[in-house]
């Protein structure tokens, strides 16, 4: 590769590398307060307080045996009930909430992706997942509802996308998972909320490739 072409590569790809580095530097700064809360009618609420990136709970709660390994990814503002395993031998309704406060980005009009996967052996049961942004930065706040996903299917994956105008910071994210047992069985669940990635990096990459093509044509003309 000639020196001119090498310089062109550096100039074309440089903005993409810089943008990626800036994103990683900003994303790695997330270390915010978050809480996991379990509730069922007739039982005292259980709350676990932590700091990103993880929170967990394991043991008996209400009419359920619970194992939750959740939290937030530190690479972007994402909250995740990533491994939620439940079992019960009686009917019951369990609510699981996860919330993070102190988020500073992204801002402006943002699309948010909510995802839910369900695998259970409890015929007649149902699971729902609600997501929300709260611009008052309140833990478990649901000021701006995003998506609601629900199903009575034993094996299914669901997703929903909704927009929210992040007009002020800091703000909070909240997930509310509701599990209704019809009489006994096991549940393996996963719920998450994260911003939909913007195509900015793809635009930069496209610009870089166009620049390389232009340099290549110019070099061929000079030969």
Question: Regions from the language model: what does each represent?
Answer:
Residues 30-195:
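Helix-boundary and membrane-interface capping/anchor signal
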Residues 3, 7, 11, 15, ...:
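Residue-level marker of intrinsically disordered, low-complexity segments enriched
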Residues 214-223:
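C-terminal membrane-anchoring or membrane-association module
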Residues 5, 131, 199, 222-223:
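Intrinsic disorder/low-complexity segments enriched in polar/small residues
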Residues 2-33, 182-210:
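Short, threonine-centered small-residue motifs that mark membrane-proximal processing/anchoring sites
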């Amino acid at each position: 590769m000639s020196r001119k072409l090498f310089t062109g590569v550096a100039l074309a790809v440089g903005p993409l590398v810089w943008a990626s580095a800036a994103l990683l530097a900003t994303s790695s700064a997330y270390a915010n307060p978050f809480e996991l809360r379990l509730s069922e009618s007739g039982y005292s609420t259980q709350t676990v307080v932590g700091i990103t990136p993880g929170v967990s709970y394991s043991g008996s709660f209400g009419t359920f045996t619970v194992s939750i390994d959740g939290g937030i990814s530190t690479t972007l503002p994402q909250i995740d009930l990533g491994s939620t395993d439940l079992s019960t031998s009686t009917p019951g309704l369990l609510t699981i909430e996860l919330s993070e406060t102190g988020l500073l980005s992204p801002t402006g009009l943002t699309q948010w992706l909510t995802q839910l996967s369900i695998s259970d052996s409890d015929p007649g049961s149902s699971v729902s997942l609600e997501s929300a942004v709260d611009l008052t930065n309140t833990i478990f706040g649901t000021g701006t509802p995003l998506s609601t996903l629900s199903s009575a299917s034993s094996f299914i994956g669901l997703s929903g996308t909704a927009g929210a105008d992040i007009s002020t910071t800091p703000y909070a994210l909240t997930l509310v998972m509701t599990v209704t047992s019809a009489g006994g069985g096991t549940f393996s669940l996963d719920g998450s909320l994260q911003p939909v990635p913007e195509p900015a990096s793809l635009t930069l990459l496209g610009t870089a490739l166009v620049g390389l093509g232009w340099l290549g044509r110019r070099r061929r003309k000079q030969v």
